[in-house]
Amino acid sequence: MRLKLLRKQKHMSQLSLAMKLNTTQMSISLYETGKREPDLKTLILIADFFDVSIDYLLERTDNPKMNK
């Protein structure tokens, strides 16, 4: 998942992103390390926040806006 890359591009900490998504810093950390997968609702929130498609977020495409 491209979550860490997108977060760093916005110069955000895990905690600040967690607060924006109404989740915990631990959840963001687990998503970034692949130890936990976000549910569909959370995937949509993340994709909308970064203005990218879910396919881009999940590395299924290199086009950030595809199928958005």
Regions found by a protein language model. Give the residues of each.
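Short basic helix-loop element that most often maps to the first helix and adjoining turn
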Residues: R2-K20
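Conserved hydrophobic/aromatic packing and binding residues within compact polymer-binding modules
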Residues: L3, L17-A18, I28-Y31, L57
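Helix-turn-helix DNA-binding elements, focusing on the entry/boundary residues of the two helices
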Residues: L3, Q14, Q25, L40-L43
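Short, charged recognition helix plus adjacent turn
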Residues: Q9, L58-K68
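DNA major-groove recognition helix of helix-turn-helix/homeodomain DNA-binding modules
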Residues: N22, K41-Y56
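DNA major-groove recognition helix of helix-turn-helix
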Residues: E32, F50, L58-T61
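Short, basic-rich loop-to-helix N-cap that marks the start of a DNA-contacting helix
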Residues: K35-L45, M66
